């Protein structure tokens, strides 16, 4: 009986929630060096745990070498120069069509292993136009999280009146 109870308690404490949902409205913009998006997870040490999505131009086409301002936060932490083509191919995709975008983080790292309990930062970066970037970030403690919304903070490289400022809007993150 004790073994069953211990196993049950272990299951309940490790399965507090299944994933984190990340939803946002994306509007395709015109202009030089725009429409670049990256979504990734960092641990409490500021190390990348997993890239969930990054646009092809920046990743697969190594666009960050042509335009240093393209997703410079993601490039700085993900270090795509050290990634193989197959690693980049696994996380990159075409720039999405305008509309609401839905992504999930399944609490795994880039190798598909469940992450240990702890604090993680989910970050969504958008290159709006040339050197103008935004980063939306939410924090989740996988060892102490309850289902519901995650507060999202926005960091801008320029004022809100910058060109293409409406590219990423209504960013929502939640524990499911």
Regions found by a protein language model. Name each.
Residues 4-14:
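Sec-dependent N-terminal signal peptides
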Residues 1-5, 39:
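Bacterial N-terminal signal peptides that target proteins for export
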Residues 44-116:
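Structured domain cores in non-transmembrane regions
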């Amino acid at each position: 009986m004790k073994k069953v109870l211990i196993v049950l308690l272990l299951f309940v404490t490790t399965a507090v929630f299944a994933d984190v949902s990340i939803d946002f409205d994306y509007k395709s913009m015109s202009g030089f060096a725009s429409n670049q998006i990256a979504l990734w997870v960092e641990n409490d040490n500021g190390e990348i745990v997993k890239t969930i999505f990054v646009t092809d131009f920046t990743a697969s086409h190594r666009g960050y070498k042509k335009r240093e301002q393209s997703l410079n936060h993601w490039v700085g932490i993900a270090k795509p120069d050290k990634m193989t083509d197959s690693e980049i191919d696994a996380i990159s995709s075409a720039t999405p069509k305008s509309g609401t975008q839905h992504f999930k983080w399944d609490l795994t790292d880039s190798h598909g292993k469940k992450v240990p309990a702890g604090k993680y930062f989910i970050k969504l970066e958008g290159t709006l136009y040339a050197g103008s970037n935004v980063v939306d970030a939410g924090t989740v403690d996988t060892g102490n999280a309850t289902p519901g919304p995650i507060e999202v903070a926005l960091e801008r490289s320029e004022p809100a009146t910058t060109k293409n400022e409406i590219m990423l809007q209504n960013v929502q993150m939640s524990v499911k």
